[in-house]
């Protein structure tokens, strides 16, 4: 759970009775959703605030700085001098219009935002009273974002084998990745993983088959590639536990087919279904993109695919991959079906079209200028799979050729992550908190 430091700020020259009522309502709201650190009273001077902060023993993950009345920049400066964590600046409404300005909270929030911007300190802004549904919804959204940021900063991505030759977009500068996101990479030799997988005994790999059988229709447990899938998945679980991994980027071809005699797609699908997001072709930023979508959507399974086809009739883009896709992403009409790799003819892979619904497409991208984020929305259409493997056809509101052209001119990497949820607002906040540009395509 997110640990939040609540700072209710007010000056005694304003209406502190109204301010304190709003403070109490806010505390009740926050206690329902986060682990709260609160002074339980208004902070009306920098000395009060400093004394309280000195007594805070547990490290918070975020600050809710509520400008209950106007207050100068000393208050927030004292907080950011002590903490580098994200801040939610919260201004409340005036209790009534006419006569004396009782709170001047909005100016307080404006002043606070200026101080934070001048300090290059990550923050978001919230306006309204704690009893408003829209405020509660946005606050919950911001907490999801900040919890995701917290998890990204401690993320350890397991990279199992180097990316294929020429797949430059799959790699990363590990130092820059850590400097920007806090995430780190742990490398595992793919052939060591193969050797470990082959030694996994049946009593350890059989439960993986039993789990897959519940979600993959007509899966043949006697197929040798099903056993190979289960053995490699079991080996991955060992590495995940040993190295404390939270995401995977796995080199799949040609090594899996040549050395293991099976496709990697099923392991990627199986683990992603369990929120251990796994990207093929050792795409490190693809794994990071999937991880962020999974956390922002409260654990929904993300997908990673290439943009491969334009369907003008449906004004849609088709995304595809060889055979990876979490089981729960399959259309209800077909369910998740086992198959063989379309090029190598080895199993087992996933064969299905993705289910319908609103989706957010997202990518953590990189250029010579540094990191950037891509986001746009679409509608996954209820259509059969378009090619062997897994596919999703994304209907757009804007002309499909215009969207495709813009994506090409922006030059984003050819792996796009998506999730069945609208998290575009959250992606914008992710960009703000990591101080990254967000390229939002009007699609």
Curated annotation (Swiss-Prot):
It is an enzyme of class 5 (isomerase). Keywords: Carbohydrate metabolism, Isomerase. It catalyses: 6-sulfo-beta-D-quinovose = 6-deoxy-6-sulfo-D-fructose. Its EC number is 5.3.1.31. It comes from the Bacteria. Signal peptide: none annotated. The keyword DNA repair does not apply. The gene is sqvD. GO terms for cellular component: cytoplasm. This is Sulfoquinovose isomerase. One of its GO terms (molecular function) is L-fucose isomerase activity. Transmembrane segments: none annotated. Part of the sulfo-EMP2 pathway, a D-sulfoquinovose degradation pathway that produces sulfolactate (SL). Catalyzes the isomerization of sulfoquinovose (SQ) to 6-deoxy-6-sulfo-D-fructose (SF). GO terms for biological process: fucose metabolic process. The keyword Heme does not apply. The lineage of its organism: Bacteria, Bacillati, Bacillota, Bacilli, Bacillales. Belongs to the SqvD family.
């Amino acid at each position: 759970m997110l640990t939040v430091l609540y700072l209710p700020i007010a000056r005694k020259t304003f209406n502190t009775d109204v301010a304190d009522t709003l403070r109490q309502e806010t505390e009740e709201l926050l206690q329902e959703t986060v682990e709260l650190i609160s002074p339980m009273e208004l902070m009306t001077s920098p000395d009060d605030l400093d004394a309280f902060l000195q007594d805070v023993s547990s490290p918070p993950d975020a600050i809710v700085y509520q400008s209950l009345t106007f207050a100068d920049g000393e208050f927030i400066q004292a907080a950011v001098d002590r903490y580098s964590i994200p801040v939610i600046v919260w201004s409340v409404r005036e209790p009534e219009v006419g006569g004396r300005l009782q709170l001047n909270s909005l100016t307080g929030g404006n002043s606070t935002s200026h101080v934070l911007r001048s300090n290059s300190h990550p923050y978001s802004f919230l306006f309204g009273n704690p009893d408003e549904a829209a405020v509660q919804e946005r606050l919950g959204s911001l907490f999801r974002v900040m919890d995701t940021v917290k998890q990204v900063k401690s993320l350890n991505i397991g990279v199992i084998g180097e990316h294929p030759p020429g797949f430059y977009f799959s790699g990363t500068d590990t130092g820059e990745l850590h400097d920007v996101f806090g995430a780190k990479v742990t490398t595992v030799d793919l052939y060591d993983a193969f050797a470990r997988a082959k030694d996994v005994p049946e009593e350890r790999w059989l439960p993986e088959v039993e789990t897959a059988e519940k979600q993959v229709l007509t899966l043949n447990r006697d197929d040798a590639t099903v056993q190979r899938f289960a053995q490699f998945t079991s080996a991955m679980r060992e590495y995940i536990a040993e190295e404390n991994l939270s995401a995977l980027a796995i080199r799949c071809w040609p090594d899996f087919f040549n050395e293991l005699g099976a496709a990697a797609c099923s392991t990627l699908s199986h683990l992603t279904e369990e929120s251990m997001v796994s990207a093929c072709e050792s795409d490190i930023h693809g794994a990071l993109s999937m991880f962020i979508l999974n956390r922002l959507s409260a654990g929904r399974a993300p997908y990673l695919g290439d943009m491969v086809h334009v369907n003008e009739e449906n004004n849609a883009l088709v995304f595809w991959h060889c055979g990876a896709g979490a089981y729960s992403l399959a259309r209800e009409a077909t369910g998740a079906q086992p198959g063989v790799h379309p090029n190598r003819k080895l199993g087992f892979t996933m064969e299905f079209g993705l289910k319908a619904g609103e989706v957010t497409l997202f990518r953590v991208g990189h250029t010579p200028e540094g990191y950037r984020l891509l986001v746009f929305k679409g509608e996954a259409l209820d259509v059969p799979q378009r090619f062997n493997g897994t596919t999703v056809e994304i209907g757009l509101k804007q002309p499909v050729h215009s969207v495709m052209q813009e994506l090409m001119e922006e030059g984003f990497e050819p792996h796009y992550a998506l999730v069945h949820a609208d998290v575009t607002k959250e992606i914008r906040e992710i960009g703000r908190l990591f101080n990254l540009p967000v390229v939002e395509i009007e699609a």
